[in-house]
Amino acid sequence: SKMAVMVTGIPEGKQVQLKIMAWWTGKEGNNFDGGNPNQKTYTLQNGFNLIDYDYTYEGLAYVSYYDAHPETMPELTVHFVNGIVNGYLSPDKTNQEMYDLCAKAPNLHMDCWGNKVHSVWTSNGLKKYCKDVNGNPKGYRQFMNVLDSLIAWEHRSLGFEKYDRLPNTRSFAYVNYTYYMFQGGYGVSFHHNQEQRVLSCKTLITNDDDAIWGLSHEWGHQHQMQPYFCWGGLGEVSNNVQSYYNITHM
């Protein structure tokens, strides 16, 4: 399919890309078949852009616009002329609004854009399983707060708060179709058949230390910055400090 994208505001000499991620690639199996999404990358320019997306499965579009000093960069305006709007979940929406987005989502997957964590799950899984700590449906805001808290606690245990080095970025989590849990090329990943556990605030907060351990352990790999928290022979050990710390807090 072809999509028209209009862009304004790209600074001269700055590269901005459109990345279309097909989180479902038609594979479900072992040996990491279905373990990672298919990514198509297109360079954007000011004005008219014709995006020729030729992958078999539909994807979600993300604008990649980075700089070492983002506060100095101008905002972009990006208009998908004939794109289909999937929407995304974020704390500024009500739980009902987010439920409706999941129920009507044209894509198999949905983005959750928290304050410290960006995650992607199946739209149906979010609609069915994302309940609050009391078991009530529509626990989206609380769910994003739980994930944000896990990252905030990891940053605290690493001294980022104490030394005023908190990153202004988001950690990532996404659903996969091959394996229970792993740290993938993009972030922490859980198999789609685990969504009943990892999307439920009641389960995460009250009775599933393994899920908290897994999220914290795998995100802990991202925080193993040599030589500060990653030493020889301890690649699967030092990050368990985050797991213990987060389970204790939760």
Describe each PLM feature range:
Residues 41, 49-51, 100, 107, ...:
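Short, flexible coil/linker segments at or flanking structured domains
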